Amino acid sequence: MNARVAVLGAGAWGTAVAKVIAGKGEDVVIWSREAETAAEINGGHGNSRFLPGVKLPENMRAVTDITEAAGGREFLILAAPSLYLLDTVKQILAVPSIREGETVIGVITKGFLPGSKGPRLILETLEDYLPGFYRKSLVYIAGPSHAEEVSRGKITGLISASESAKNSIRFRYLLKSNRLLVFSSFDVRGVQAAAAAKNVIAIAFGMLDALKTAAGNTGAGDIFGDGTESLLLAAGLNEIQILGRAMGATHAETFTSISGVGDLDVTCRSVFGRNRRFGRDIIEKHILNPFRNLDDLISRIGEIGYLPEGVVAARHVKTLAEKYKLRIPISIGLYRILNRETEPVQFLHDFLNGLR
């Protein structure tokens, strides 16, 4: 393609996507907030902080000046965590190629963003900040994937969702390879809602998984098993569908394909999942003990040492449930745990009792 690509965000997922594209011979620059990370990518062709053990292509270079990274690029991929995404977008608004609509913009960030009337999907929020010609042309990329696997060439599938068929296809060809399969979707709202909401379910799944494997040390009793996890997974998928429809999803198959059940499954079950890991840490390491409530946890999230997107999403999902009058007990229960209103074991018993 001979594409000029910028990836804004040098975390694990941004680095993995940049590696895939650079590995196809494209001109790729990645923007890093941290000078140390940029120096390591350029000098040692690695990113030991976010993607240890992965060798990066020599034609992939890093910069710390965001306008240098974004300027004159044909493709721009936003990879900052949801907490920092709007700040990243505001920094590129003065870039001429962005201001003049010469760049196709894709987003790989998962989550919701705050709005004046409550939480919003990522693309609809970004459209308010970007020039008007980007409306209905942004591309959202999601699917059952982990940076640790994609960067090592494990076969994986992604969804390229956009109201612009042309731009969806352009990103498909930019990303796809023999080991990375990319499919198109026009249900942009459904794909975004599923990608954000599944992180909340994954934290609950991680708690259950920890209780299942260490029940004797928690006082929960040896009552949780693989079948219990399947109950939670199925009920969680139903909650994602309920929320997605309320937010404007247009296709039922969005939730039965890789953007729905596929993404939920890998997020819940993979050892690489940060949300699953956080759920396990709630049980095994009592990681919530230093925090008074969810707001305190979010404001001090850096103390965790990694960023589970489901923590931020839980607050937004709770607000959306109230706005749309939705019954989504797993998501609300998880919010109450993070807000220090209830204990994990009690939540799981309440959830199971609610199924009877």
PLM-predicted stretches and their roles:
Residues 1-53, 60-64, 115, 221:
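NAD(P)+-binding Rossmann beta1-loop-alpha1 motif at the extreme N-terminus of oxidoreductases
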